[in-house]
Each structure stands twice: as structure tokens, then as C-alpha cells.
Amino acid sequence: MSDPRKESLIVERFEMRASTEPKEGELELYSLFSIIFGFLGIMLKYKICLWVSAVCCVAYLSNLKSKDSSVRTILSPVSLSLMGLVMAYFGPNSNLFV
């Protein structure tokens, strides 16, 4: 039996996979942006800053590894973004938020 394929036309292909690992400083940036936008949203009374803070917080929590987790590093951005959103929508001065 002869093989009908021509060896000169065979091209080996390697599957390229995108790395799903976050870069080294990416997690800290998500946490930092969450805290910064949370403070800006509370101090300047901007709801959009509070929502950006919440999105950065969710991105931070979704990429967090168990070895990186400590209570303080998790609780700071989460509490600040949630506190800002609660103040913006349910607080006594919620009409002042833009």
C-alpha cells in the first residue's frame, strides 16, 4: 500500500494558546483603580465613578488567586465600592449624586 500524501506538502501546525494568567501587576491595578474611583465617586458624588469602581472590583475578585488573598486586600476595594453605591442610591443625600 502506498501513502497518497506527499511529505513535502505536510505542514505541522502548533496550536497557539493565549495565556489566561493575569500579568504580574494587573491585580494590584484593578484593586488600586477600584479604591481610587470609589473615593472619587464618594467625594465628587459621581455615580459613574462608583460603577467603574464596582467593575474594577469585580475584575479584581475574578482574577484573584487563593495565595494572594488576605482579608484586608479583599475587603478594602469591595467595601469602598459597595458603600459608595449604597450611598449613591439609598442614602439620605442620594439626590446630590450626579
From Swiss-Prot:
Keyword Membrane found: yes
Main location: membrane
GO MF, one example: protein folding chaperone
UniProt KW keywords: Membrane, Transmembrane, Transmembrane helix
One Pfam family it belongs to: ASTER
Species for this entry: Dictyostelium discoideum
Cellular localisation: Membrane
GO cellular component: endoplasmic reticulum membrane
Domain of life from the UniProt record: Eukaryota
Family under the similarity heading: Belongs to the Asterix family.
Transmembrane segments: 32-52, 78-98
GO biological process, one term: protein insertion into ER membrane
Entry membrane topology: Multi-pass membrane protein
PANTHER family according to UniProt: CGI-140 (PTHR13193), PAT COMPLEX SUBUNIT ASTERIX (PTHR13193:SF0)
Name by which UniProt lists this protein: Protein Asterix
